[in-house]
């Protein structure tokens, strides 16, 4: 799922490619993509794209008449810019919508059969605000605001980082990287964090997001993001199960869930303790190793 760094770079590219230009026509190519009825989606045809915003992981296109088009990429949604006559590079069933401009087309695609990605058209600032879960902006929040938000309820640190009601725009991938940088267990409870750990987490969050925004900007340069992914070779732990941690060399571990997994380094983050994997630990029961040292025996 595209997260804050990915969406920031998308917005910067969209600013170069479509802001100030007239949307000739929006073609909806999937019956599932539109999640709003009023105002009519046709009301933005022939309108100028006046600006862009980000609401968490959502991309907002601003039009006249107080209209806002909200694009939610979800897990497999992507945006692709093509010059006139160029194909989107995806099968027809994966193309959700086409934003046609005079000098090219912005394709909204989804490489999944679940069809979770969506478009909504809303009118007015209040309607737009209603779509915002209200989490803090990670790069704008003060340390005190961050501390208060984390301690408001007792959740695992992993859950709090990815909860859009607490923090805006962070998902599974960058939360893994943040926690590795902060040297914190993903399952540590937020109310058990001491002041030093909160400072470490705050600093790690800001540093990680900034590093990856810069990295993705450097990859895209003046073009359009084409390889938006949750997995990067330069990541420390995310998507690197069984590969060596770049800090200590221990194999990266995982906690498997239904749709994804949490990756961490037991040596760097949990004092060597292996966190229970919901599938394997139940299967192995008493044979489940409790530490990274037992695993390596």
Q: Can you annotate each of these PLM segments?
A:
Residues 22-40, 53, 58, 79, ...:
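Basic, nucleic-acid-binding surfaces and adjacent catalytic neighborhoods in DNA/RNA-processing proteins
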Residues 63, 69-184, 189-192, 196, ...:
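Phosphate/anion-contacting hairpin/loop surfaces
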Residues 1-129, 267-275, 279-297:
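Acidic, proline/glycine-enriched N-terminal capping motif
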């Amino acid at each position: 799922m595209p997260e804050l760094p990915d969406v920031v770079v998308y917005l910067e590219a969209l600013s170069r490619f479509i802001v100030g230009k007239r949307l000739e026509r929006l073609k909806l190519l999937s019956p599932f993509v539109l999640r709003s009825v009023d105002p009519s989606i046709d009301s933005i045809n022939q309108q100028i794209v006046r600006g862009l915003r980000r609401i968490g992981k959502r991309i907002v296109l601003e039009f006249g008449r107080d209209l806002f088009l909200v694009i939610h990429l979800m897990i497999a949604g992507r945006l692709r810019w093509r010059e006139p006559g160029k194909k989107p590079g995806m099968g027809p069933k994966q193309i959700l919508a086409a934003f046609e401009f005079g000098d090219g087309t912005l394709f909204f695609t989804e490489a999944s059969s679940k069809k979770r990605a969506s478009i909504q058209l809303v009118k007015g600032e209040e309607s737009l605000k209603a779509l915002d879960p209200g989490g803090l902006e990670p790069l704008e929040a003060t340390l005190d605001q961050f501390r208060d938000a984390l301690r408001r309820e007792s959740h695992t640190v992993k859950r709090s980082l990815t909860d859009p009601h607490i923090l805006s725009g962070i998902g599974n991938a960058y939360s893994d990287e943040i926690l590795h940088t902060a040297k914190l267990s993903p399952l540590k409870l937020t109310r058990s964090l001491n002041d030093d750990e909160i400072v470490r987490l705050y600093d790690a969050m800001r540093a990680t997001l900034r590093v990856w925004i810069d990295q993705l900007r450097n990859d895209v340069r003046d073009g359009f993001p084409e390889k938006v992914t949750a997995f990067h070779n330069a990541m420390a732990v995310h998507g690197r199960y069984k590969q060596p941690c770049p800090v200590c060399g221990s194999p990266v571990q995982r906690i498997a869930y239904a749709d994804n997994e949490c990756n961490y380094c037991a040596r760097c983050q949990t004092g060597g303790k292996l966190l229970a994997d919901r599938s394997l630990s139940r299967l192995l029961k008493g044979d489940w190793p409790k530490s990274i040292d037992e695993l390596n025996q």
